[in-house]
């Protein structure tokens, strides 16, 4: 009897286990598939969305300005040097711009004062010339400034030459309008005042832009879009009618 029971029970257990196990596996598969489906986002979200930066730059403003000491001065990282430069240039502008002083006259009078002080130092006070402070202009910064100015002037001349020779009426008209606007601005200020304004802007605008670039860039993007729209309208109405 026991053998018969074993023979009967044995075949019955296999289909029971076979029916139970696949259902459990199917249940687990459905759970995992539903979990994976729920974990999938509904729509792809860009991780690294492009951020508009003025002039299409991809580097920090400090690196755009060349880095090093000049960039530190322009961005007010070295406040003592920046304030010293602005103060000195402001004094020079006030003396020669509003004070009515002449550069040659001031240089000659300064040289006379230097000669008098040197004479008193060496003769009346019986001081040796070796104890006097040497005054000289360093050569390297002047050469760098002259080289940079020469490069910019050559680029400007090359640009004007290419505009004059490429026979593109649109570029020619735009260049003439730009130069005319600069000449109008030049009538409002003297050359020394223009240099002073440019110097102050160079030493203030980069610092303010670096400080508030997250607020300035969206406004600049909207302004660029509007300017492009107005330029397209201007080109369609006027520039497109100019023969090539």
UniProtKB/Swiss-Prot annotation:
Database matches in PROSITE patterns: RETICULON
GO cellular component terms given for this protein: endoplasmic reticulum membrane
UniProt entry tagged with the keyword Transmembrane helix: yes
UniProt keyword Zinc-finger present: no
InterPro entries assigned to the protein according to its UniProt record, in alphabetical order: Reticulon, Reticulon-like
Chief location of this protein within or outside the cell: endoplasmic reticulum
Topology versus the membrane: Multi-pass membrane protein
GO BP annotations, alphabetical order: response to bacterium
Reticulon domain sequence ranges: 70-244
Pfam families reported in the protein's UniProt record: Reticulon
Transmembrane stretches, start-end: 80-100, 103-123, 172-192
Cellular localization per UniProt: Endoplasmic reticulum membrane
Domain of life: Eukaryota
The entry's keywords: Endoplasmic reticulum, Membrane, Transmembrane, Transmembrane helix
Stated name of the protein: Reticulon-like protein B7
């Amino acid at each position: 009897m026991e053998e018969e029971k074993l023979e009967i029970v044995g075949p019955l257990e296999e289909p029971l286990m076979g029916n139970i196990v696949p259902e459990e596996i199917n249940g687990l598969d459905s759970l995992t598939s539903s979990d994976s489906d729920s974990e999938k986002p509904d729509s792809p979200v860009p991780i690294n969305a492009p951020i508009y930066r003025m002039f299409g730059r991809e580097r920090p403003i400090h690196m755009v300005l060349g880095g090093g000491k000049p960039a530190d001065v322009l961005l007010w990282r070295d406040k003592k040097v920046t304030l010293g430069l602005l103060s000195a240039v402001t004094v020079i502008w006030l003396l020669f711009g509003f004070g009515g002083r002449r550069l040659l006259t001031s240089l000659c009078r300064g040289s006379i004062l230097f000669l008098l002080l040197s004479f008193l130092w060496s003769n009346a006070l019986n001081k040796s010339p070796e104890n006097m402070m040497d005054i000289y202009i360093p050569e390297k910064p002047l050469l760098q400034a002259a080289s940079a100015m020469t490069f910019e002037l050559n680029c400007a001349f090359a640009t004007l030459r290419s505009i004059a020779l490429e026979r593109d009426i649109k570029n020619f008209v735009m260049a003439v309008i730009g130069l005319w606007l600069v000449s109008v601005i030049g009538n409002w200020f003297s050359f020394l005042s223009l240099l002073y304004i440019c110097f102050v802007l160079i030493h203030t605008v980069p610092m303010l832009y670096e400080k508030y670039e997250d607020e300035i860039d969206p406004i600049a993007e909207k302004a660029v879009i509007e300017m492009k729209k107005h330029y397209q309208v201007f080109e369609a109405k006027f520039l497109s009618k100019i023969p090539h």
